[in-house]
């Protein structure tokens, strides 16, 4: 036995080594370096990570809504081993585990952190395990894992081994409770550090812990340390075997320093001088053997070589980009700057010690490249703070002026010319509306800068508005129009025409927030220039202005006035009255301070506060709640009897929230009751710091996540909101305006879905009581605020988790214990399990005693048995019993704690009689019989082996003798017999005649290629074809099924049915050669032609996938016209009429199974071979067959019978698909709801803008009784007048095969006609699961306005439909 155990251990070690080495990505291969990645909105965007081995920057995966777990299947990025900054995961739905996505991510450097953290997992609602089992080093920063309600395996990871430097600052809270997690680590994951503990990422992956001698760096699978220059592991002992390098990597080798003639780049790799970025927009510096973006402190760019840095002599020149100084914070951006590359514009209205602050921040500026403008700086008295200014180059000027001073009410002095010498290279001076600035002060500057005084005009320097205190008279300026939106106001006013047009310098638009009306233009100002008014200058040639960046639902005061020359005639100025306007409403921010508590086992009470920014009149709130499903199968794997169970505390009641229950902080007063002890100052300070830090982190997260998109003109999203998507999370809300404001207790809405997301609307209240909930269950709660204006939408969700209280009697064992069997020294007992326990039963306690014994019943230690073991053995067996009477009782234990003990049950164990009975024939076995049985069994075994070898040989090499199977179009390959075989025939094509050109996409059995076939078509030496393949890993049965489904088309010869060109069945891989349909399938064709202006459709994942298809390059982007739709409908009906004439029932007619040729002719094709590509269009029955329920007729859904008339129903759905450009039928309904809806007589609604005549044809196809539906020939007859003339030449309807057929009238068809072939897909009693339909676009018709509503088609309705 020990030998066997030892061999098993060696095999396991070897397997671990192979797997480890197979997953390892050695760095000595070619690196594929990617920049920072921000992946959001769609799962498909993850493919940007393909081939990346190192991300030099951060990786953010966030805000992916409406995704399911299966959407991530097939996605894996094993090449990625290193991230140099941080890794952020935030609100990604459907993602449960990272082990498959990033199996080899080993290092997160943390060069730049996300708010002090290198790894952040925040509000990942579906995440169950982190699973980064290769992660070995976080070299800088900490870990923050918070608010992940399903995340387990956190206590089985020792982060001190991974993030040693930031371990003390790790923040891991508000995830799934430990006692609710399985957290099962295999025995090989047990280490001693310093105490014995199990460390693993999941049940199949241990945490890698290296010996102390290796300094956290060891090899995978075998013992041994990595080279000292490695981090993240290695696959060998040298510096070339590292997964990642601790210092620098160069040519696949990890080094402490870069070699000569190379430069350190981004602190991780060595590059040559040529590789250091050197472009027009980015000139990196070569300094001290580093390639860096800017010169370090104390150095400046070399004048002769911009690639080098030279040490400064004295004050180091510092170049800065120009900009506006409108506050002290803005001035601080120029601290230390000596050269301004651009303009220096100062417009500062006030502040404490403003001159000192400006001198400290702007006092070193020596040169300005463009111009200096001092505009409306009411707090300035002098410009002496620009004490070092020596040169204004005037490369770009403000309307021709290099020094521009306008409207500075308190400016009295310019510069101290005894210490200042300013040169202006180009441009003039401009001084206007500086009432305290004397003219001689201005002329002094004119002289100092070297401008001739005679070159100065009144247009440049006003003789009347500088140094004067004169009041100007104003004419009335009329505001003609005010338009508002949620964040801007558009003003239009009457044109002002002074006697001399040159007198008008500009208009000034002023605005400010105000709650009241009746203010004047001087309100909000003081003598120091502090003002609440904001102003904009507008060109004198314009009489309109757009004020942007405003707050929604806010009242603003508006004023327009003119600036004219002071020397102009009386009445040359004008201003308007102050008018008021309110911006439009917008969606509010999410509700604040959501608190959920439970006061009973079936109730949750939710309270919240209004949004910080209601942005309108918040009238109601939508509260959504859904019970969190528990993975019972996984949770039962934990051995609760060994580890013990800490009862889970449900969500607190209101009293618990208000009062602190911790006993050490309580004291007793005179009446014996407890009161809360006051907290110490240190405790209060720590709580305040933690709360402030938490708020600061979440603000940082939201401000960095919800950033404004590039090229986006609308206002950026408000922070702390969920993103707005094309399909709002609250799109199915129901607003009941008659609901009383006092009705706050709302029971959950009944629904067939066993665990739906429910919602209720709360009007004019900030609390709701949810009743009828399941006891001791965790619910995810979302509270959404909505304004009265439904058009602006609702807020993002405020999300909380809460658990109802336990039901005290739910864990009690119902009924009595049954003694199933008593045998020798054992008794098998069975008892019924609790019907509806608190969460789930984890184990049972069993107490038994022999009656008459002297030990006390209550003092006996109970036995413990896990629930899953009890279920597996159908009871519990007590062994090692001696004869006598016994008494036993049981109790169940759930996550809520122990249930009540059951009643006593007694049983009797008889004394065993061990003496043999010579008269018992069962105890007498003849030796001859035993020998005969052994020989017979050996012979049977030999015969079975011989038969197995013969059968496998026949299956593998006996293809020539295998008969053909039955051929028919199968939606469900699982239902085909495994005996179906394929025999090569005249359709066989030599493999060498087929040439593959490029991939077109993935098919049901394998890849589909575009190719060329030689000498396959008569008189055509080379033709383009589509080649379907079967995967090399496919089984023999799958290859035969692949060939048999292709064989269906061998008997077809119709222009509107895809033609089979040949089959290559000999050798591997198996090929099926088809007619090339250059524009792909009709579903993607329609989606590629959706108009771009349909925002929510053209941006959908399905539309993007269709537009990125290989077929798109053969296509144009114009949507099909109504005439095109009718033409497509006609040719599809013609192809189906041919199949009906051949007694062939398609059973899966849909746009996905129709193909489009280069000339846009549509043909019936594929016959069941596309179901894997569009798996979301199918519905799996009982884990087996895939059914296209959204295209199936009522009789097919009810009894599983398919005829050509059921194909006509599917044809009507195809017409609906074409009218909506391939929207999904029955959107918003689950597959089970669709099944019931159709069986009950429901049909698809008319798409918006769809012509009545086309919808009438759809309804004809959707007649409930199949005998009332038209045949495909009748449909062609109806449509033929609208079809192109070429149709008559190629159609089956006009062919000799159909010649002489009398048009089939509807009344000629028997009600229960069995003329067509009937096939039964599934038994009538089949059960259907309630899998919801996948998210899809809102149905629409692209034909709005393109034709009269009544259409131009003369639709002839068959006689029988008139009844």
Swiss-Prot record:
List UniProt keywords, sorted A-Z: ATP-binding, Cleavage on pair of basic residues, Disulfide bond, Glycoprotein, Kinase, Manganese, Membrane, Metal-binding, Nucleotide-binding, Phosphoprotein, Receptor, Repeat, Signal, Transferase, Transmembrane, Transmembrane helix, Tyrosine-protein kinase
Q: Which residues carry this modification: Phosphotyrosine?
A: 1174
According to the UniProt record, where is the region Disordered?
739-759, 1091-1117, 1316-1363
E.C. code = 2.7.10.1
Q: Which cofactor does it need?
A: Mn(2+)
Q: Which Pfam families match?
A: fn3 (PF00041), Furin-like (PF00757), PK_Tyr_Ser-Thr (PF07714), Recep_L_domain (PF01030)
**Matches recorded under InterPro entries:** FN3_dom, FN3_sf, Furin-like_Cys-rich_dom, Furin_repeat, Growth_fac_rcpt_cys_sf, Ig-like_fold, Kinase-like_dom_sf, Prot_kinase_dom
Question: What's the family?
Answer: Belongs to the protein kinase superfamily. Tyr protein kinase family. Insulin receptor subfamily.
Subunit note: Probable tetramer of 2 alpha and 2 beta chains linked by disulfide bonds. The alpha chains contribute to the formation of the ligand-binding domain, while the beta chains carry the kinase domain.
Name assigned to this protein = Insulin-like peptide receptor
Organism of provenance: Branchiostoma lanceolatum (Common lancelet)
């Amino acid at each position: 036995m020990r030998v066997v155990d030892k061999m098993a251990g060696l095999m396991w070690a070897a397997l671990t080594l192979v797997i480890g080495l197979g997953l390892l990505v050695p760095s000595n291969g070619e690196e594929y370096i990617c920049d920072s990645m921000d992946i959001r909105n769609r799962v498909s965007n993850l493919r940007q990570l393909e081939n990346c081995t190192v991300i030099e920057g951060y990786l953010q995966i966030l805000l992916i809504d409406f995704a399911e777990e299966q959407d991530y299947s097939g996605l894996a990025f094993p090449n990625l081993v290193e991230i140099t900054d941080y890794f952020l995961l935030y609100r990604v739905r459907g993602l449960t585990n990272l082990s498959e996505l990033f199996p080899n991510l080993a290092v997160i450097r943390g060069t730049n952190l996300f708010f002090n953290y290198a790894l952040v997992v925040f509000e990942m609602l579906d995440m169950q395990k982190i699973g980064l089992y290769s992660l070995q080093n976080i070299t800088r920063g900490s870990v923050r894992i918070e608010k992940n309600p399903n995340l387990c395996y956190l206590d089985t990871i020792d982060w001190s081994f991974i993030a040693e430097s930031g371990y003390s600052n790790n923040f891991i809270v508000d995830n799934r409770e430990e006692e609710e997690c399985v957290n099962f680590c295999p025995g090989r994951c047990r280490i001693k550090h310093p105490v014995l503990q199990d460390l693993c990422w999941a049940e199949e992956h241990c945490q890698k812990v290296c010996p102390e001698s290796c300094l956290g760096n060891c090899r995978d699978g075998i013992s041994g340390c990595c080279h000292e220059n490695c981090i993240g592991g290695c696959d060998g002992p040298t510096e070339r075997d590292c997964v990642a390098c601790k210092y620098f990597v160069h040519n696949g080798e990890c080094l402490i320093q870069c070699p000569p003639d190379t430069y350190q780049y981004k602190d991780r790799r060595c590059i040559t001088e040529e590789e250091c970025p050197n472009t027009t927009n980015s000139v990196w510096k070569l300094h001290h053997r580093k390639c860096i973006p800017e010169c370090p402190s104390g150095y400046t760019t070399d004048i002769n070589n911009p690639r080098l840095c030279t040490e400064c002599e004295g004050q180091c020149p510092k170049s800065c980009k120009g900009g506006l100084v409108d506050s002290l914070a803005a001035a601080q951006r120029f601290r230390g700057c000596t050269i301004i590359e651009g303009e220096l514009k100062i417009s500062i209205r006030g502040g404490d010690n403003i001159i000192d602050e400006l001198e400290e921040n702007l006092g070193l500026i020596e040169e300005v490249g463009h111009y200096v403008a001092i505009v409306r700086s009411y707090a300035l008295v002098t410009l002496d703070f620009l004490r070092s200014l020596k040169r204004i180059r005037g490369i770009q000027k403000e309307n021709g002026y290099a020094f521009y001073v306008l409207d500075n009410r308190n400016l009295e002095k310019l510069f101290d010319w005894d210490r200042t010498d300013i040169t202006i290279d180009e441009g003039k001076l401009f001084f206007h509306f500086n009432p305290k600035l004397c003219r001689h002060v201005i002329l002094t500057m004119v002289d100092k800068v070297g401008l001739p005084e005679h070159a100065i005009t009144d247009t440049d320097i006003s003789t009347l508005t500088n140094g004067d205190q004169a009041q100007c008279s104003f004419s009335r300026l009329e505001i003609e129009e005010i338009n508002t939106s949620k964040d801007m106001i558009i003003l239009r006013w009457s044109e002002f025409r002074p006697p001399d047009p040159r007198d008008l310098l500009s208009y000034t638009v002023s605005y400010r927030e105000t709650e009241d009306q009746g203010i004047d233009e001087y309100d909000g100002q003081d003598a120091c220039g502090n003002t609440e008014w904001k102003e904009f200058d507008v060109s004198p040639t314009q009489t309109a202005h757009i004020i942007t960046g405003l707050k929604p639902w806010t009242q603003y005061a508006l004023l327009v006035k003119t600036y004219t020359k002071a020397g102009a005639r009386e009445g040359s100025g004008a201003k308007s009255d102050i008018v008021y306007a309110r911006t439009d409403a917008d969606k509010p921010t999410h509700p604040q301070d959501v608190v959920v508590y439970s006061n009973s086992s079936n109730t949750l009470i939710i309270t919240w506060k209004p949004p910080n920014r209601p942005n309108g009149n918040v009238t109601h709130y939508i509260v959504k709640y859904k019970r969190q499903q528990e993975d019972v199968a996984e949770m039962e794997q934990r051995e609760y009897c060994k580890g013990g169970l800490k009862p889970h505390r449900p969500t607190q009641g209101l009293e618990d929230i208000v009062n602190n229950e911790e006993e050490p902080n309580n004291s007793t007063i005179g009446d014996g009751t407890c009161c809360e002890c006051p907290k110490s100052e240190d405790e209060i300070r720590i709580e305040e710091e933690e709360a402030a830090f938490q708020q600061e982190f979440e603000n940082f997260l939201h401000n960095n996540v919800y950033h404004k998109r590039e090229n986006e003109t609308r206002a950026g999203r408000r922070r702390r909101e969920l993103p707005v998507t094309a399909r709002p999370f609250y799109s199915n809300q129901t607003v009941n305006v008659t609901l009383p404001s006092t009705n706050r207790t709302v029971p959950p809405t009944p629904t067939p879905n066993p665990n739906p997301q429910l919602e209720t609307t709360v009007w004019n209240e900030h609390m709701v009581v949810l009743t009828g909930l399941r006891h001791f269950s965790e619910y995810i709660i979302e509270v959404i605020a909505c304004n009265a204006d439904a058009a602006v939408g609702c807020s993002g969700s405020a999300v909380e988790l809460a658990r109802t209280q336990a039901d005290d009697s739910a864990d009690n064992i119902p009924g009595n214990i049954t003694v199933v069997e008593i045998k020798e020294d054992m008794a098998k007992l069975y008892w019924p399990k609790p019907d509806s326990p608190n969460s789930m039963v984890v184990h049972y306690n069993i107490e038994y005693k022999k009656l008459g014994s002297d030990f006390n019943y209550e003092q006996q230690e109970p036995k413990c048995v896990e629930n899953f073991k009890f279920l597996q053995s159908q009871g519990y067996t007590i062994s090692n019993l001696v004869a006598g009477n016994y008494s036993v009782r049981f109790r169940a234990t759930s996550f809520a704690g122990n249930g009540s003990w059951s009643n006593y049950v007694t049983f009797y164990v008889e004394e065993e009689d061990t003496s043999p009975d010579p008269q018992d024939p069962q105890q007498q076995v003849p030796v001859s019989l035993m020998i005969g049985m052994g020989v017979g069994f050996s012979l049977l075994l030999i015969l079975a082996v011989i038969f197995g070898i013969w059968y496998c040989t026949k299956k593998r090499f006996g293809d020539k003798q295998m008969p053909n199977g039955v051929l028919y179009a199968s939606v469900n390959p699982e239902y085909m017999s495994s005996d179906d075989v394929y025999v090569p025939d005249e359709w066989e094509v030599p493999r060498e005649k087929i040439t593959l050109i490029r991939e077109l996409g993935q098919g049901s059995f394998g890849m589909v290629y575009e190719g060329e076939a030689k000498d396959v078509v008569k008189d055509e030496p080379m033709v383009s074809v589509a080649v379907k393949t079967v995967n090399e890993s496919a089984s023999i049965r799958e290859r035969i099924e692949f060939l048999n489904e292709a064989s269906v088309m061998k008997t077809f010869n119709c222009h509107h049915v895809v033609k089979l060109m040949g089959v290559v069945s000999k050798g591997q891989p198996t090929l099926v050669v088809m007619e090339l349909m250059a524009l792909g399938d009709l579903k993607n064709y329609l989606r590629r032609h959706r108009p771009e202006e349909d925002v929510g459709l053209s941006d959908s994942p399905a539309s993007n996938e269709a537009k990125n298809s290989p077929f798109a390059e053969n296509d144009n982007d114009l949507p099909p016209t109504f005439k095109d739709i009718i033409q497509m409908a006609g040719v599809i009906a013609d192809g189906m009429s041919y199949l009906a004439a051949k007694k062939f029932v398609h059973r899966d007619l849909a746009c996905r199974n129709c193909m489009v040729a280069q000339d846009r002719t549509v043909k019936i094709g594929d016959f069941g071979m596309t179901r894997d590509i569009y798996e979301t269009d199918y519905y799996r029955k009982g884990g087996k067959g895939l059914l296209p329920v959204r295209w199936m007729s009522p009789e097919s859904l009810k009894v599983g019978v398919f005829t050509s008339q059921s194909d006509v129903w599917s044809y009507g759905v195809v017409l609906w698909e074409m009218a909506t450009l391939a929207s999904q039928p029955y959107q918003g309904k689950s597959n089970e709801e669709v099944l019931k809806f159709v069986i009950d007589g429901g049909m698809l609604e008319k798409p918006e803008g769809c012509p009545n005549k086309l919808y009438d044809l759809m309804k004809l196809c959707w007649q409930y009784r199949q005998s009332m539906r038209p045949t495909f020939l009748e449909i062609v007859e109806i449509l033929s007048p609208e079809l192109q003339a070429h149709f008559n030449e190629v159609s089956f309807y006009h062919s000799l095969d159909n010649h002489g057929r009398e048009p089939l009238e509807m009344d000629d068809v028997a009600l229960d006609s069995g003329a067509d072939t009937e096939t039964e897909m599934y038994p009538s009693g089949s059960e259907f699961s309630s899998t919801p339909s996948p998210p899809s676009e809102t149905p629409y018709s692209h034909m709005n306005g393109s034709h009269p509503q009544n259409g131009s088609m003369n639709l002839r309705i068959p006689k029988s439909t008139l009844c």
